[in-house]
Regions:
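A polyanion-binding, active-site-adjacent surface
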Residues: 2-185, 194-198
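Flexible loop residues that form catalytic
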Residues: 191
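Glycosyltransferases and closely related glycan-assembly transferases
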Residues: 200-204
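Short, flexible loop segments at boundaries between secondary-structure elements
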Residues: 205-210
Length: 210
């Protein structure tokens, strides 16, 4: 099985595991872009995960105007569409929050962290293909959590019982990604991602930075 097929299979398994979970209030809406934006995420994997890597960049979870819209980690619209070249169809989640509509590549809002990250990569590398030769970007958790008001709720704010179940499957997915791509480094974007990488990859011989 090819590297990209292994990564796709791991993502599908993670998506299925997450879809079986329930989350209590104040969480009222949960988006899983590995579900409704799967064609775009699969296209991303097929372009980005075809070689072993030197570095894997790890984020916490999708932002409302990034991966939630595009299916690509830190997926700022213009970077996903114009630099990476993603053009797959993106549908809507079943329980869409009226204040957080999914507009896909037509979304007019910009993910600030994604604009910075992919902007940095596009300045350093002449093409996305060149970047993906040795680098990959993935989120630890694929889910977006919202409260009744539409406020974003990050995974570190979940109850301990909810977090324990979710973190287990997310850690297992991260382990599979790193085991498959064999990077020298995992670079965490933020303290939460760094903590999860240290836990999930504890028995692998790998460098973890932030």
């Amino acid at each position: 099985m090819s590297l990209s097929n292994n990564i796709s299979k791991a993502a599908r398994n993670l998506s299925s595991a997450c879809n079986s979970m329930d989350f209590a209030k104040p969480v009222t809406h949960v988006y899983n872009p590995l579900d409704y934006a799967w064609p775009a995420h699969k296209q991303y994997i097929e372009r980005a995960a075809i070689t072993k890597k030197k570095v894997v960049f790890l984020g916490m979870n999708p932002g409302p105007f990034g991966m939630a819209q595009t299916g690509v980690p830190f997926g700022e619209i213009s970077a996903v569409r114009d630099w990476i070249g993603i053009d797959a169809p993106i549908t809507k989640p079943e329980n869409e929050h009226p204040k957080r509509p999914i507009e896909g590549l037509n979304c007019q809002r910009s993910e600030v962290s994604g604009r910075r990250l992919w902007g940095l990569f596009s300045k350093r590398f002449e093409s996305a293909e060149n970047f993906f030769t040795n680098h990959y970007v993935v989120n630890h958790c694929p889910l977006v959590f919202m409260e009744e008001t539409g406020k974003n709720r990050t995974p570190d704010k979940l109850s301990s019982s909810e977090a324990e179940t979710l973190m287990k499957v997310c850690d297992e997915h991260l382990y599979k990604v790193v085991e498959t791509l064999e990077p020298n480094w995992v670079i965490a974007v933020g303290t939460f991602a760094e903590k999860r990488a240290m836990i999930a990859l504890d028995n692998l011989d790998i460098n973890i930075g932030k």
